[in-house]
């Protein structure tokens, strides 16, 4: 019996040392990305299944190499904070099925160019801020359905000096009942779609908003896809240049100087023997 106890004690001590040494390694290996879902940081540990975050359900996942956030029949509901906040350069939100974001602050706020695409539908509502908030950057809505609603701002830029809004073959509604439905953009481009509500509304470059009879529109703006329009793909210059690990960490130097392994080189997977 004593021998067995001694063996068990030795095994327990060995397991403790292994755990102590393994924990820092695990912690160091985790990578954080410039992306938050329901005010929770996206990392290499949770990016494959972001439905583990409180207030998130459905399929929500992030590919750090392709910089694609996939929403598939997803619901993101946060009582105090942002639904999605991004500082990822060239982030793509891919919509599959019907998705709903509800947040007290911005439903989607971003400081780097954002493209929303995928063919699905998104309902984005802010209870006390912007449904979409482009902070000194551009927003592209491409071949999908987007509905933005807030009692304050619908789809909004920040300074209105540099932000650009492009809607390409998409159906969009925007409503900001107190401060404007689509506003604070330096430029607004419609490709293969038109403003159909309110009748006669258009982007006013001087006021930098969608206006009607010289006044900013605060009721629902409806942009309808033209079924007869020829599809116009938007050039994609977002492929990450350089060498990255599979977890999305950028590496310095040249491939020839790196150890054996699998890397992402200029957006393509490369195996170094």
Question: Model-flagged regions — what are they?
Answer:
Residues 22, 62, 86, 109, ...:
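Generic structural signal for beta-strand residues in well-ordered domains
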């Amino acid at each position: 019996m004593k021998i067995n106890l001694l063996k068990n004690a030795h095994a327990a001590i060995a397991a403790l040392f292994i755990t102590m040494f393994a924990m820092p390694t695990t912690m160091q290996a985790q990578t954080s990305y410039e992306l938050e879902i329901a005010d929770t940081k996206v990392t290499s540990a949770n990016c494959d299944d972001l439905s583990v975050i409180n207030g998130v359900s459905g399929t929500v996942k992030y590919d750090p190499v392709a910089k694609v956030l996939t929403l598939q029949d997803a619901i993101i509901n946060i009582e105090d904070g942002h639904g999605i906040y991004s500082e990822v350069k060239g982030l793509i939100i891919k919509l599959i099925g019907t998705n709903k974001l509800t947040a007290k602050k911005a439903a989607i706020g971003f400081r780097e160019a954002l493209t929303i695409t995928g063919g699905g539908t998104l309902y984005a509502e802010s209870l006390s801020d912007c449904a979409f908030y482009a902070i000194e950057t551009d927003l592209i809505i491409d071949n999908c359905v987007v509905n933005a609603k807030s009692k304050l701002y619908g789809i909004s830029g920040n300074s209105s000096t540099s932000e650009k809004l492009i809607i390409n073959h998409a159906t969009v509604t925007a409503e900001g009942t107190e401060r404007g439905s689509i506003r604070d953009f330096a430029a607004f481009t419609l490709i293969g779609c038109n403003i159909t509500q309110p009748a006669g509304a258009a982007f006013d470059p001087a006021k930098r908003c969608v206006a009607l009879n010289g006044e900013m529109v605060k009721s629902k703006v409806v942009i309808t896809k033209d079924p007869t329009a020829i599809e116009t793909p938007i050039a994609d210059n977002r492929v990450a240049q350089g060498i990255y690990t599979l977890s999305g960490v950028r590496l310095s130097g040249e491939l020839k100087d790196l150890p054996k392994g699998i890397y992402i080189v200029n957006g393509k997977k490369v195996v170094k023997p």
